[in-house]
Amino acid sequence: MPHNSIRSGHGGLNQLGGAFVNGRPLPEVVRQRIVDLAHQGVRPCDISRQLRVSHGCVSKILGRYYETGSIRPGVIGGSKPKVATPKVVEKIGDYKRQNPTMFAWEIRDRLLAEGVCDNDTVPSVSSINRIIRTKVQQPFNLPMDSCVATKSLSPGHTLIPSSAVTPPESPQSDSLGSTYSINGLLGIAQPGSDSKRKMDDSDQDSCRLSIDSQSSSSGPRKHLRTDAFSQHHLEPLECPFERQHYPEAYASPSHTKGEQGLYPLPLLNSAALDDGKATLTPSNTPLGRNLSTHQTYPVVADPHSPFAIKQETPEVSSSSSTPSSLSSSAFLDLQQVGGAGVPAGASVPPFNAFPHAASVYGQFTGQALLSGREMVGPTLPGYPPHIPTSGQGSYASSAIAGMVAGSEYSGNAYGHTPYSSYGEAWRFPNSSLLSSPYYYSSTSRPSAPPTTATAFDHL
């Protein structure tokens, strides 16, 4: 066989006994014989034994033949022959312009069908795609676009150069502000250089937009500054924060006006703040023990510990004639009375959920306060309007102001009728309610309900 003759060069015998020359392809005759045996149906392993060619060489030759149809060897250690000739590139461009959706493998088949290329010179699918991408479909040329872009840009808008080059400033940007500033975008003229605020070097590095960090000292450059506000703009922004919208209700050592921490909030929020201060006297008692009279809250107290009411009367006397309308400047202080009140062996009635029925009100004299309803006023729901009896009379402000000491309070028990024994006429004085017996039936009460006048007499 021709390939058995060892030519000059490095050669030898393979594992099958066949001769080969190192770095040289198989002869053309052996390649054709391999392809012919494969067409006859001989397996690659049998072809390798018959021709004494390595199995890898047979597989490589057959694989290339099935893929490209060529049996020529590839070039080792050099460049392949150029298949993308100008004629082939022009044809590929014509095919793509005629049918833009044409695939690369269809272009390859058409090149072979029209005889533009043969099996050895036809470009591969990847080569055709590369030719279409780089040479056929070129939307723009970089040099031309750079020239057009440079011409279309205004003098104030230039392309960003490399980091080593600083873009020059134009005269228009000096008069209308920096290109990247709000004043420059809105066309607002900036004030003179004497009113500009200056920053130190550390703030300039963090707050400016600059391409070149090593700027030259040829002239001042404009940067985007986050704090570039004039005093004219800062004053209206800071005014709302200087006003105190929420006055402090608790006194603290840092108060510049210490008297404001001891007055009730409604007086501080009123328009006539100065007039209210003139009628009030600051109290040294902690605020937790001071309550203004119009802020009425039910007091739940232990029935075993009597309390005394001490009223701090201001310099200006109240003009009210009823206990329910105390002066807003008065403060009530509840203090526990020790030793005076209920005796040790006396029986104390059970605790009632309603404040006016608790025994704590039994420690008050009848002339001072009648019941809890006198403190909270007649406007609360569930309380009838107060009709004083003949023994009670009317109460002047002096009677309330001159409270007796805690040791002189009467220790008599609370002798009024409990709330649960009042009838429907007491709880429903208004006839406009929707059918009061519908909610509270009178069948469960054997005694007849008292009249309105009788119910009020119990008070």
From Swiss-Prot:
Cellular component GO terms, alphabetical: nucleoplasm; nucleus
GO biological process, one term: cell differentiation
Phosphoserine sites (modified residues): S305
UniProt keyword Magnesium, yes or no: no
Keyword NAD found: no
Localization: Nucleus
PANTHER family found in the cross-reference section: PAIRED BOX PROTEIN PAX-6-RELATED-RELATED, PAIRED BOX PROTEIN PAX-8
Protein name: Paired box protein Pax-8
Organism of this sequence: Canis lupus familiaris
Lineage of producing organism: Eukaryota, Metazoa, Chordata, Craniata, Vertebrata
